């Protein structure tokens, strides 16, 4: 294992600005909180094909890197997307649709309600737009297809044709633009 690390540039850098004793205040809790995590888990675990994914222990690599332990959460097979981050984009699609339904009808909905066809008319009028270099766009496109809304994904000129096709295979309109990822973000 040490041979593996010696063949590659590797350095462990500690964050010099970390404040381990800093309070987790209202500003942080507004973004990431226990209730939000419970809600996300409840919704995502209700999606068709949901299965927990493994947490893999990389003890040899941890030893070679001189760290106490190292773990890898293997998301690559989740929902058959072949993406290392399949949940966030699709969950964001749900949250946008959920918010639009709440805004237009005052009703609270779940993923199951949407799978059962509730508010199909509202969902059909939603267009989700995002920029990506690949994995995020695949998740967003899959989520849009799953929930029944339109999806436009912007990619930059350097994104491979394979990634473009993978995103388009979920029904998204993919728009390739000149420039960088930041240019794709501006278009989205």
Where are these regions (language model features)?
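PLP-dependent amino-acid enzyme catalytic core
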Residues: 1-188
């Amino acid at each position: 294992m040490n041979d593996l690390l010696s063949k590659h540039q590797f350095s462990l850098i500690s964050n010099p600005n970390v404040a381990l004793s800093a309070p987790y205040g209202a500003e942080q809790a507004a973004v990431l909180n226990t209730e939000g995590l419970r809600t996300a888990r409840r919704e995502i675990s209700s999606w068709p094909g949901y299965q927990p994914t493994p947490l893999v222990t990389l003890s040899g690599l941890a030893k070679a890197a001189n760290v106490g332990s190292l773990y890898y959460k293997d998301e690559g097979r989740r929902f058959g997307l072949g993406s290392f981050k399949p949940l966030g984009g699709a969950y964001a699609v749900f949250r946008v649709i959920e918010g639009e339904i709440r805004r237009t009808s005052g009703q609270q909905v779940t993923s199951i309600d949407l799978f059962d066809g509730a508010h199909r008319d509202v969902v059909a009028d939603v267009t989700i737009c995002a920029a990506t270099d690949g994995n995020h766009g695949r998740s967003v496109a899959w989520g849009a297809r799953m929930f029944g809304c339109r999806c436009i994904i912007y990619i930059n000129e350097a994104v491979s044709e394979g990634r473009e096709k993978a995103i388009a295979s979920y029904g998204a309109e993919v728009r390739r633009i000149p420039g960088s990822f930041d240019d794709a973000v501006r278009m989205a």
